[in-house]
Amino acid sequence: MNNILNFYPAVITTDVAENWQIGFQDPATPIMEGIINLHYDLMFFICVISVFVSWMLGRTLWHFEQNQNKIPSSLTHGTLIEMIWTVTPAFILLIIAVPSFSLLYAMDEIISPAITIKTLGHQWYWSYEYSDYLNEDDDSINYDSYMIPEEDLEIGQFRLLEVDNRMVIPINTHIRVIVTAADVLHSWAVPSFRSKCDAIPGRLNQTSLFIKREGVYYGQCSEICGINHGFMPIVVEATSLPNYVSWISNKLNE
């Protein structure tokens, strides 16, 4: 039960970076969906502005080329045009700012979490603690997550991304992840969640998750933390609530 979704086809359950990928991974949280939608909205403005500026530059170079225009223009001031190129960009920035501010607010909002998971970064592995659950000895669920060496990988597993113990969470549940570090700076990052939370020794940072679909999601430490920085991947397994409860029960009985 440690890796609940191993029997599903990898193409369905894995959200992982691909070779030569330049776009986003498939979103698994409402926040990531909002970020992607905002990106597409901004790209519209970027394309329109880029085409307009390129046209203006080309038109200027063509009409004011030395061989065609021996006498340079003496225009030094134009109130109307100056108002236009001041007010128009300000209006565009305002249109862009409103949805981005609401998204930034939502990214920092922690909504009545049902589960709290503590994440601790080490050189060079992650530790997870589920302090909401205690066994008969009042011990919480606590385990380390190391990268699987390349020679131990099974067919279909991803090089430099697989771990021996995944972080397991339920879908459609508000989750709080508390992140810190034991030695140097780390960063807990999973692209499909839009999550990137710095792990700082002596400080607790937090982020929230609300996963909408089952799957296995891959991330990596995103803060240079030493010689093996590239060898501390993150794997999050999102499963149904009954499977999650079963996994918790097995962990408590170990």
From Swiss-Prot:
What EC number(s) is this enzyme filed under? Answer: 7.1.1.9
The yes or no answer to whether the keyword Metal-binding is present is yes
Residues on the membrane's Mitochondrial intermembrane side span: 1-37, 105-254
Is Translocase one of the keywords? Answer: yes
- Sites binding Cu cation A1 sit at 186, 221, 225, 232
User: What keywords are annotated for this sequence in UniProt?
Assistant: Copper, Electron transport, Magnesium, Membrane, Metal-binding, Mitochondrion, Mitochondrion inner membrane, Respiratory chain, Translocase, Transmembrane, Transmembrane helix, Transport
Q: Which InterPro entries match?
A: CcO_II, CcO_II-like_C, CcO_II_C, Copper_CuA, Cupredoxin, Cyt_c_oxidase_su2, Cyt_c_oxidase_su2_TM_dom, Cyt_c_oxidase_su2_TM_sf
Name the residues that bind Cu cation A2: 221, 223, 225, 229
User: Where does it localize?
Assistant: Mitochondrion inner membrane
SUBUNIT field: Component of the cytochrome c oxidase (complex IV, CIV), a multisubunit enzyme composed of a catalytic core of 3 subunits and several supernumerary subunits. The complex exists as a monomer or a dimer and forms supercomplexes (SCs) in the inner mitochondrial membrane with ubiquinol-cytochrome c oxidoreductase (cytochrome b-c1 complex, complex III, CIII).
What is the protein name given in its UniProt record? Cytochrome c oxidase subunit 2
Organism, by scientific name, is Chondrus crispus (Carrageen Irish moss)
